[in-house]
């Protein structure tokens, strides 16, 4: 693909960039878990490979009972905001993080991230996640009670009031507040920013970017989702607003917004993305199915195949890494097709190596992808 071939050259021209970003608000301690199928001895086991197999195991236990062993493969930082931030920091962004990293002390899993960050504001304790990994996807089991203490008043108190927040936001190229679904007061926080921070923001020749990721809104009511979409739209007053979704989410948002796309459409994904983007009135809607990435900006639609990995080392966080690459691309003023391609490279590297790439590693990955080596 020509745009993959061209990406590495475009990135080389951007080396040595200086970007500031402010990201929040969640934080999770993730345990990456493999459910056991058969155990050969106390060290060796075969895992349950697919979600379907796992579902069959559970279904067979109905009316009876069963015991499924879970093996923790890794304990790591989690949450959309921290994983997104970790990837951006690896790229060399000067980043401030605000969120649920632990109080009074930051949880040790976040220390590598916070040591690289320009500044950190930890406002409450993190949530906990059990991530059951399979070859065809993952099941995320979350414990979120600690996040209910993260309110607009707590944000203001921890960040120097509306004036302190405005100063931080006003100095950034990109501002992001992630994981609306799991933060029960996020809509109120957004409303507080609109009401109290927007009037304090300086006028700029070009509006900075604002990035939002809902994180699977299925469990929230349609009224909640509709309100959140309206608030995200209002950020367009001060920002070039980006909403990042996966394929499942974009169809859910379309339904909430009353958008119906016929199943007979020759490209249902494109038609849905374009319609949701237009309905929301925002700068950009980016959607990442498992094997592809696309976005709508202005009146244009952009699409790329991705470097699909059949047997990933790690999938939890793949979407956040894609978001990081895409956001970095737009912040570097890459064209939209190059930005989604950088997102695909970032995610592609991450699932193969279980870590985020550096800028040089992303360039090398793009070259390998173009050469058919990934």
Where in this protein do the model-derived segments appear?
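Ribokinase/PfkB-type carbohydrate-kinase core domain
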Residues: 1-64, 71-80, 90-301, 353-374
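A structural signal for well-ordered alpha-helical segments within the folded catalytic domains
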Residues: 79-82, 86, 248, 324, ...
């Amino acid at each position: 693909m020509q745009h993959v071939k061209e990406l590495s050259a475009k990135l080389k021209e951007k080396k040595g960039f200086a970007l500031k970003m402010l990201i929040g608000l969640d934080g999770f301690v993730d345990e990456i878990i493999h459910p056991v199928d058969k155990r050969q001895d106390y060290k060796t086991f075969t895992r349950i490979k697919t979600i379907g197999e796992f579902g069959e195991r559970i279904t067979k236990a109905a009316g009876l009972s069963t015991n499924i062993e879970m093996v923790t493969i890794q304990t790591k930082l989690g949450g959309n905001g921290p994983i997104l931030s970790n990837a951006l920091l690896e790229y060399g962004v000067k980043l401030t993080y605000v969120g649920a990293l632990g109080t009074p002390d930051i949880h040790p899993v976040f220390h590598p991230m916070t040591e690289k960050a320009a500044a950190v504001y930890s406002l409450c304790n993190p949530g906990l996640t059990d991530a059951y990994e399979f070859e065809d996807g993952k099941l995320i089991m979350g414990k979120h009670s600690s996040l209910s203490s993260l309110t607009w008043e707590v944000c203001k108190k921890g960040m120097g009031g509306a004036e302190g927040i405005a100063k931080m936001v006003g100095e950034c190229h990109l501002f992001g507040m992630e994981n609306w679904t799991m933060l029960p007061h996020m809509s109120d926080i957004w409303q507080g920013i609109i009401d109290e921070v927007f009037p304090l923001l300086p006028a700029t020749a070009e509006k900075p970017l604002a990035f939002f990721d809902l994180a699977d809104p299925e469990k929230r009511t349609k009224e909640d989702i509709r309100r959140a979409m309206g608030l995200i739209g209002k950020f367009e007053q001060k920002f070039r607003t980006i909403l990042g979704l996966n394929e499942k989410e974009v169809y859910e948002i379309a339904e909430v917004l009353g958008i119906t796309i016929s199943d007979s459409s020759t490209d249902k994904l494109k038609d849905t993305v374009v319609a949701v983007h237009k309905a929301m009135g925002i700068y950009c809607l980016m959607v990442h199915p498992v094997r592809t990435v696309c976005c709508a900006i202005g009146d244009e639609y952009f699409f790329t195949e991705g470097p699909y990995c059949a047997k990933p080392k790690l999938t939890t966080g793949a979407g956040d890494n894609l978001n990081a690459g895409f956001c970095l691309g737009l912040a570097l003023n890459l064209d939209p097709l190059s930005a989604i391609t950088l997102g695909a490279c970032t995610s592609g590297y991450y699932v193969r190596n279980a870590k985020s790439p550096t800028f040089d590693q992303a360039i090398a990955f793009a070259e390998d992808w173009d050469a058919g080596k990934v």
